[in-house]
From Swiss-Prot:
Any one GO MF annotation of this record: gamma-glutamyl-gamma-aminobutyrate hydrolase activity
Catalytic activity: 4-(gamma-L-glutamylamino)butanoate + H2O = 4-aminobutanoate + L-glutamate
Cellular component aspect of the GO annotation: cytosol
Keyword Transport: no
Listed name of the protein: Gamma-glutamyl-gamma-aminobutyrate hydrolase
EC number: 3.5.1.94
Active site: 114, 222, 224
Gene this protein is translated from: puuD
Length: 254
């Protein structure tokens, strides 16, 4: 049996919650299981690790960074807008932005999902639509909370893959496919540092990658949902873990 301790170490950002009155940081199992099934070892990263001296000690131990989805939203002041965000998680923002900036500098692989994509957009100088439902030209991208969870994560709309990018390299035989959709915010302006990898039929950005980086991919949908059952999802996670293995080899050569 393979020793999981030999697998790439993937740092996973958590979300702030309250449990019976106590401040708590949590991770949904589906995000962790997707990494394990793809051959990685997920390690939860407490928000306190955003402190620069701790982050500096942490980064050499990580082979990849995983930014999962969340019920919370990125604070608007981080992308130049005024107003409060009722569903904010400032400590997650702080850690995620620090991790993204460090990973881009050190060429550490990143896989970002839903809120994670939005963090990647903001960290590289872009901005977000705060309420997609107020954009009349866009589809309804939110899930129906009254439906069972399995139906909330069912395919909702197609995405069209842009040619010549990371996503098309990972999925060379698949230029369009159906995805689930469970988000109220989305990319508005994408920095020149990013390549748009896929769009939904209404033109909304559904995937991005960082230009001149070995693997920094963000997707707006949720491939972690039952990832082992869907070939496209497995390919994304396995591509991420393969990039992490290449990063390990690069570190060993230095």
């Amino acid at each position: 049996m393979e020793n999981i301790m030999n697998n790439p170490v993937i740092g996973v950002v958590m979300c702030r919650n309250r449990l019976k009155g106590h401040a708590t940081q949590t991770l949904q199992e589906k995000y962790l299981n997707a990494i394990i099934h793809a051959g990685g070892l997920p390690i939860a990263l407490p928000h306190a690790l955003a402190e620069p001296s701790l982050l500096e000690q942490l980064l050499p131990k990580l082979d990849g960074i995983y930014l999962p989805g969340s019920p919370s939203n990125v604070q608007p002041h981080l992308y130049g807008e005024n107003g409060d965000e009722p569903d904010a998680d400032p400590e997650r923002d702080l850690l995620s932005m620090a991790l993204i900036n460090a990973a881009l500098e050190r060429r550490i692989p990143i896989f970002a999902i839903c809120r994670g994509l939005q963090e990647l957009v903001v960290a590289t100088g872009g901005s977000l639509h705060r309420k997609l439902c107020e954009q009349p030209e866009l589809l309804e991208h939110r899930e129906d909370p009254e439906l069972p969870v399995e139906q909330q994560y069912a395919p909702s709309h197609e995405v069209q893959v842009e040619e010549g990018g990371l996503l098309s390299a990972l999925l060379p035989e698949c230029s369009n496919f159906w995805v689930n959709s469970l988000h109220g915010q989305g990319a508005k302006v994408v920095s020149p540092r990013l390549r748009v990898e896929a769009r939904s039929p209404d033109g909304l950005v559904e995937a991005v990658s960082v230009i001149n980086h070995p693997f920094a991919l963000g997707v707006q949908w949720h491939p972690e949902w039952n990832s082992s059952e869907y070939a496209l999802s497995r390919i994304l996670f396995e591509g991420f873990i393969t990039a992490c293995q290449h990063h390990i080899a690069e570190k060993q050569r230095l």
